[in-house]
Amino acid sequence: AHPLVIEKDLAAANPKEFVAEYKWDGIRVQIVSHSEGCRLYSRTGDEVSKSFPEIIKTIQGNFVLDGELLAGINNDPKTFNDLQQRLNKKAPSEKFIKKNPCFIKVYDVLFFNGDDLRDKTLIERKKVLNSYFSTNRSPMFLSETIEFKDWRFLDKIRDISNKQIHEGVMIKSVSSPYIAGRPRGKWFKWKRNPKNVDAIIMYAQRGHGKRSSFYSDYTFGVFNKEKELVPI
């Protein structure tokens, strides 16, 4: 998805031709399930199944789904920092899993029961997902769409309270097929307005997969009233 250029992209876009979803603050995953079991893959193609055994053992079916892996339980997401605890464990214990549960928000489907749905429109693919999630599929949950009539209303939703665990909204053309990469004009990400804070870098950690050679994950700290440096 391309970052949204408000003056350019919204001016030419009809709200009726798009759907909106929350941009969840987790990691993007593909869920590949078939007769031999289930596997999870990151956006870089790295398999992360062993880090989330409690998820893959409960998923059954014949499909490839696209979604967001989040920390939390019962469809109630926590922060990305909470998820980071799980990402650092390649073989988590049962005790650790219970203390740091995770689930998946699903927002698209590529294959279902042997059918390749990538050339279908987004609306057609959503119908397949709505049917599949008409029954409980925990620890997977359908990522809900946001009802909106105009861009001004969606703008307010996008920048809603910091208590909401999302980075903004995704805007997707209802007629769009599932296309790899970042095709312009079909999917847009509209992030929240940035917030400013004076902080101190406390820790730096290497990323995962292709980002493992870079220090891409940082923990910042601020001073509390007792003048103690605490992580945020």
Write out the residue ranges for each language-model feature:
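Catalytic cores of nucleic-acid ligases and guanylyltransferases
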Residues: 1-232
